[in-house]
């Protein structure tokens, strides 16, 4: 079995719940193109699946996000976690697998076979900026169309304290979180897998388009995009996604 395949005991769960770079994309459903997908590793040995998407219309802006698909050494370098005696995929693994199925029709494990060494800009802690670095790029995904459900999220900025722990700084930033993916025809990954009609993107968009999820400690709740344009945008976030350690 490939190290990227989930064990048969792992209970997969749906990530396609309707639920309640530059300036962040507003919450909504977008047609995009996969500009790059590459792997990175944190100091704890956790592995991230890093994506760069480009809108197919409008301002053609980029969206960057990373999904943690393997836990660090302290937690066994696993693609899953155990809770109440049952095994479940890491949340990041589920979203990354959703993208792989949507774009290629194949699982994350299969897409790993297309890895090639590529130069990508990765955060360099010594230089304190992004620098060209060789990383495995998943080329079966690059240049392909994808549909994505995106949330705009306000979260705390974090910095290390005297103990080396990341804590909120009191400032916030606006970022994007990809919820799930689909193909160019509008079928989500789960609809493709289960041979179901395309309905989830429309249902999700009706409930979530234009909303903002506020996860910061300064303010909780959800509001419209127009209401939060005064908050810190991703324009000021020129640093990498990998300045902080993963939560796994």
Predicted regions and their residues:
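Short beta-rich binding modules
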Residues: 1-248
């Amino acid at each position: 079995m490939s190290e990227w395949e989930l064990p048969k005991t792992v209970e997969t769960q749906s990530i396609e719940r309707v639920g309640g770079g530059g300036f962040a994309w507003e919450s909504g459903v977008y047609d995009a193109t996969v500009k790059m997908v590459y792997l990175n590793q944190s100091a704890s040995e956790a592995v991230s699946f890093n994506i760069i998407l480009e809108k197919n219309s409008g301002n053609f802006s980029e969206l960057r996000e990373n999904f943690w698909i393997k836990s660090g050494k302290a937690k066994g370098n696993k693609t899953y976690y155990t809770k109440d005696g049952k095994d479940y995929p890491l949340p990041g693994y589920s979203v990354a697998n959703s993208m792989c199925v949507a774009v290629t029709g194949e699982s994350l494990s299969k897409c790993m076979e297309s890895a090639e060494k590529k130069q990508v800009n990765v955060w360099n802690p010594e230089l304190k900026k992004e620098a060209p670095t060789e990383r495995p790029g998943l080329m079966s995904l690059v240049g392909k169309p994808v549909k994505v459900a995106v949330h705009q999220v306000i979260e705390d900025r974090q910095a290390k304290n005297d103990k080396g722990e990341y804590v909120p700084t009191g400032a916030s930033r606006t970022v994007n979180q990809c919820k799930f993916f689909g193909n160019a025809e509008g079928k989500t990954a789960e609809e493709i897998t289960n041979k179901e009609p395309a309905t989830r993107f429309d249902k999700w968009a009706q409930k979530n388009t234009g909303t903002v999820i506020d996860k910061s400690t300064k303010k909780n709740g959800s509001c419209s995009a127009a209401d939060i344009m005064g908050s810190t945008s991703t324009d000021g976030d020129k640093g990498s996604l990998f300045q902080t350690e993963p939560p796994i």
